[in-house]
């Protein structure tokens, strides 16, 4: 399955998300980036998808990942650009340029925080934005992306059926 790019989704995490579990746990919780990646891989697998998870503190690396997704023909992108969501026109332009279905994710509710976090450039390039659900937002994002791209799951393992 990993050889089929049309079954692959990229899960891209931006700056400081490597510090999950220790950075501001009152805001971001105690789950680590490894926990997030495990959740994404497990959720994607339920839909017959392969989640390829990456994290970078560097804007250009994230832009390169978006470009690579187009070249490889991946099915979709889950993006938590962290603070770059609020500042990066480069990420916005990259997402607009590749035309790959994208869901923006934020662990915290960015609209209930500082005013500078209320605006997201990357959200304008995504078909959906999910915030405030903790790391469960990644599961919700993959579920929504799977529906958007027509990936299906067996009802015995369907995470939405278990809710």
UniProtKB/Swiss-Prot annotation:
It comes from the Bacteria. GO terms for biological process: amino acid biosynthetic process; aromatic amino acid family biosynthetic process; chorismate biosynthetic process; quinate catabolic process. The keyword Lyase applies. InterPro entries: DHquinase_II, DHquinase_II_CS, DHquinase_II_sf. PANTHER family: CATABOLIC 3-DEHYDROQUINASE (PTHR21272:SF3). Homododecamer. Catalyzes a trans-dehydration via an enolate intermediate. This is 3-dehydroquinate dehydratase. It comes from Bradyrhizobium sp. (strain BTAi1 / ATCC BAA-1182). The lineage of its organism: Bacteria, Pseudomonadati, Pseudomonadota, Alphaproteobacteria, Hyphomicrobiales. The gene is aroQ.
